[in-house]
Amino acid sequence: MSVADIKKGVEQKMQRSIEAFKNDLAKIRTGRAHTGLLDHVQVDYYGSMVPISQVANLTLVDARTIGVQPWEKNMVAKVEKAIREADLGLNPATAGDLIRVPMPPLTEERRRELTKVVKGEGETAKVAIRNLRRDANEALKKLVKDKEISEDDERRAGDDVQKLTDKHVAEIDKLVQTKEAEIMTV
Protein backbone atom coordinates (compact mmCIF):
# COMPACT_ATOMS: atom_id res chain seq x y z
CA MET A 1 0.00 0.00 0.00
CA SER A 2 1.39 3.41 -0.98
CA VAL A 3 1.02 6.82 0.63
CA ALA A 4 -1.30 7.89 -2.20
CA ASP A 5 -3.52 4.83 -1.59
CA ILE A 6 -3.74 5.65 2.11
CA LYS A 7 -4.64 9.30 1.47
CA LYS A 8 -7.17 8.40 -1.23
CA GLY A 9 -8.75 5.72 0.97
CA VAL A 10 -9.02 7.95 4.02
CA GLU A 11 -10.56 10.77 1.98
CA GLN A 12 -13.19 8.41 0.51
CA LYS A 13 -14.03 7.04 3.95
CA MET A 14 -14.28 10.56 5.40
CA GLN A 15 -16.60 11.55 2.57
CA ARG A 16 -18.78 8.49 3.28
CA SER A 17 -18.89 9.52 6.97
CA ILE A 18 -20.08 12.98 5.94
CA GLU A 19 -22.79 11.45 3.71
CA ALA A 20 -23.95 9.20 6.57
CA PHE A 21 -24.05 12.24 8.86
CA LYS A 22 -26.15 14.16 6.32
CA ASN A 23 -28.58 11.22 6.18
CA ASP A 24 -28.81 11.20 9.98
CA LEU A 25 -29.51 14.94 10.01
CA ALA A 26 -32.22 14.57 7.37
CA LYS A 27 -34.17 12.31 9.73
CA ILE A 28 -34.29 14.98 12.45
CA ARG A 29 -37.58 16.85 12.22
CA THR A 30 -37.38 20.64 11.99
CA GLY A 31 -41.05 21.65 11.85
CA ARG A 32 -40.79 22.20 8.11
CA ALA A 33 -42.14 19.40 5.93
CA HIS A 34 -39.81 17.44 3.66
CA THR A 35 -40.33 14.02 2.12
CA GLY A 36 -36.97 12.75 3.42
CA LEU A 37 -38.56 12.61 6.86
CA LEU A 38 -40.50 9.49 5.84
CA ASP A 39 -37.62 7.77 3.99
CA HIS A 40 -36.95 5.22 6.72
CA VAL A 41 -40.63 4.39 7.35
CA GLN A 42 -41.24 0.72 6.53
CA VAL A 43 -44.65 -0.50 5.31
CA ASP A 44 -45.98 -4.07 5.45
CA TYR A 45 -46.52 -4.88 1.76
CA TYR A 46 -48.04 -8.35 1.39
CA GLY A 47 -45.97 -9.79 4.22
CA SER A 48 -42.63 -8.07 3.61
CA MET A 49 -41.43 -4.74 4.98
CA VAL A 50 -40.56 -2.21 2.25
CA PRO A 51 -39.67 1.52 2.34
CA ILE A 52 -42.70 3.80 2.03
CA SER A 53 -41.32 5.23 -1.24
CA GLN A 54 -41.85 1.81 -2.90
CA VAL A 55 -45.58 1.71 -2.18
CA ALA A 56 -46.56 5.39 -2.35
CA ASN A 57 -45.81 8.71 -3.99
CA LEU A 58 -44.53 11.35 -1.52
CA THR A 59 -45.17 15.03 -2.26
CA LEU A 60 -45.14 18.34 -0.41
CA VAL A 61 -48.65 19.76 -0.17
CA ASP A 62 -47.38 22.94 1.53
CA ALA A 63 -44.57 24.02 3.87
CA ARG A 64 -46.04 22.06 6.77
CA THR A 65 -47.79 19.12 5.09
CA ILE A 66 -46.58 16.00 3.27
CA GLY A 67 -48.95 14.26 0.89
CA VAL A 68 -48.68 10.46 0.65
CA GLN A 69 -50.51 8.81 -2.26
CA PRO A 70 -50.34 4.98 -2.09
CA TRP A 71 -50.33 3.32 -5.51
CA GLU A 72 -52.86 0.71 -4.39
CA LYS A 73 -56.10 1.66 -2.64
CA ASN A 74 -55.88 -1.30 -0.25
CA MET A 75 -52.52 0.04 1.05
CA VAL A 76 -53.91 3.35 2.39
CA ALA A 77 -54.64 2.01 5.90
CA LYS A 78 -51.31 0.14 6.10
CA VAL A 79 -49.31 3.20 5.02
CA GLU A 80 -51.16 5.42 7.49
CA LYS A 81 -50.52 2.89 10.28
CA ALA A 82 -46.81 2.68 9.37
CA ILE A 83 -46.44 6.48 9.52
CA ARG A 84 -48.27 6.63 12.85
CA GLU A 85 -46.11 3.84 14.34
CA ALA A 86 -42.80 5.23 13.02
CA ASP A 87 -42.35 7.18 16.27
CA LEU A 88 -41.89 10.52 14.51
CA GLY A 89 -44.64 12.29 16.44
CA LEU A 90 -46.75 12.57 13.28
CA ASN A 91 -50.51 12.14 13.04
CA PRO A 92 -51.56 11.35 9.44
CA ALA A 93 -55.12 12.02 8.24
CA THR A 94 -56.68 10.16 5.32
CA ALA A 95 -58.95 11.85 2.76
CA GLY A 96 -60.01 9.24 0.20
CA ASP A 97 -56.79 7.71 -1.12
CA LEU A 98 -54.55 10.66 -0.13
CA ILE A 99 -52.88 10.65 3.27
CA ARG A 100 -52.04 14.12 4.57
CA VAL A 101 -49.24 14.26 7.14
CA PRO A 102 -49.25 17.67 8.87
CA MET A 103 -46.08 18.70 10.71
CA PRO A 104 -46.99 19.76 14.23
CA PRO A 105 -45.17 22.95 15.27
CA LEU A 106 -42.22 22.26 17.56
CA THR A 107 -42.31 23.57 21.11
CA GLU A 108 -39.36 25.61 22.37
CA GLU A 109 -38.38 22.76 24.68
CA ARG A 110 -38.47 20.23 21.82
CA ARG A 111 -36.37 22.56 19.66
CA ARG A 112 -33.68 22.70 22.36
CA GLU A 113 -33.75 18.89 22.69
CA LEU A 114 -33.33 18.54 18.93
CA THR A 115 -30.35 20.93 18.88
CA LYS A 116 -28.73 18.75 21.54
CA VAL A 117 -29.40 15.68 19.39
CA VAL A 118 -27.87 17.45 16.37
CA LYS A 119 -24.76 18.40 18.38
CA GLY A 120 -24.46 14.81 19.62
CA GLU A 121 -24.72 13.46 16.06
CA GLY A 122 -22.10 16.00 15.01
CA GLU A 123 -19.71 14.86 17.73
CA THR A 124 -20.23 11.23 16.74
CA ALA A 125 -19.41 12.10 13.12
CA LYS A 126 -16.27 14.01 14.22
CA VAL A 127 -15.12 11.01 16.26
CA ALA A 128 -15.57 8.81 13.18
CA ILE A 129 -13.42 11.24 11.14
CA ARG A 130 -10.73 11.30 13.84
CA ASN A 131 -10.72 7.50 14.00
CA LEU A 132 -10.12 7.41 10.25
CA ARG A 133 -7.21 9.84 10.75
CA ARG A 134 -5.77 7.57 13.43
CA ASP A 135 -6.06 4.52 11.16
CA ALA A 136 -4.32 6.40 8.32
CA ASN A 137 -1.51 7.54 10.62
CA GLU A 138 -1.03 3.98 11.87
CA ALA A 139 -0.82 2.75 8.27
CA LEU A 140 1.81 5.43 7.55
CA LYS A 141 3.82 4.40 10.62
CA LYS A 142 3.71 0.81 9.40
CA LEU A 143 5.14 1.90 6.04
CA VAL A 144 8.02 3.63 7.85
CA LYS A 145 8.58 0.56 10.02
CA ASP A 146 8.66 -1.63 6.91
CA LYS A 147 11.13 0.88 5.39
CA GLU A 148 8.87 1.55 2.41
CA ILE A 149 8.87 5.33 3.01
CA SER A 150 11.10 7.77 4.91
CA GLU A 151 10.07 9.56 8.09
CA ASP A 152 9.93 12.84 6.12
CA ASP A 153 7.45 11.28 3.70
CA GLU A 154 5.43 10.02 6.66
CA ARG A 155 5.39 13.50 8.21
CA ARG A 156 4.27 15.10 4.92
CA ALA A 157 1.55 12.48 4.42
CA GLY A 158 0.49 12.88 8.06
CA ASP A 159 0.13 16.63 7.50
CA ASP A 160 -2.02 15.95 4.43
CA VAL A 161 -4.22 13.55 6.43
CA GLN A 162 -4.53 16.22 9.15
CA LYS A 163 -5.63 18.78 6.54
CA LEU A 164 -8.27 16.33 5.28
CA THR A 165 -9.42 15.79 8.87
CA ASP A 166 -9.65 19.54 9.52
CA LYS A 167 -11.58 20.06 6.28
CA HIS A 168 -14.13 17.35 7.08
CA VAL A 169 -14.53 18.41 10.73
CA ALA A 170 -15.18 21.99 9.54
CA GLU A 171 -17.80 20.65 7.12
CA ILE A 172 -19.50 18.78 9.98
CA ASP A 173 -19.48 21.96 12.11
CA LYS A 174 -21.07 23.88 9.23
CA LEU A 175 -23.77 21.22 8.77
CA VAL A 176 -24.51 21.26 12.53
CA GLN A 177 -24.83 25.07 12.56
CA THR A 178 -27.13 25.04 9.53
CA LYS A 179 -29.36 22.34 11.04
CA GLU A 180 -29.52 24.14 14.42
CA ALA A 181 -30.53 27.37 12.69
CA GLU A 182 -33.20 25.44 10.76
CA ILE A 183 -34.54 23.90 13.98
CA MET A 184 -34.60 27.17 15.93
CA THR A 185 -36.39 29.06 13.13
CA VAL A 186 -40.04 29.30 14.11
From Swiss-Prot:
GO terms for cellular component: cytosol. Keywords: Cytoplasm, Protein biosynthesis. Gene3D superfamilies: 3.30.1360.40, Ribosome-recycling factor. The keyword Cytoplasm applies. One of its GO terms (biological process) is cytoplasmic translational termination. It comes from the Bacteria. The keyword Cytoplasm applies. Pfam families: RRF. Its main location: cytoplasm. It is found in: Cytoplasm. GO terms for molecular function: ribosomal large subunit binding. Responsible for the release of ribosomes from messenger RNA at the termination of protein biosynthesis. May increase the efficiency of translation by recycling ribosomes from one round of translation to another. Belongs to the RRF family. This is Ribosome-recycling factor.
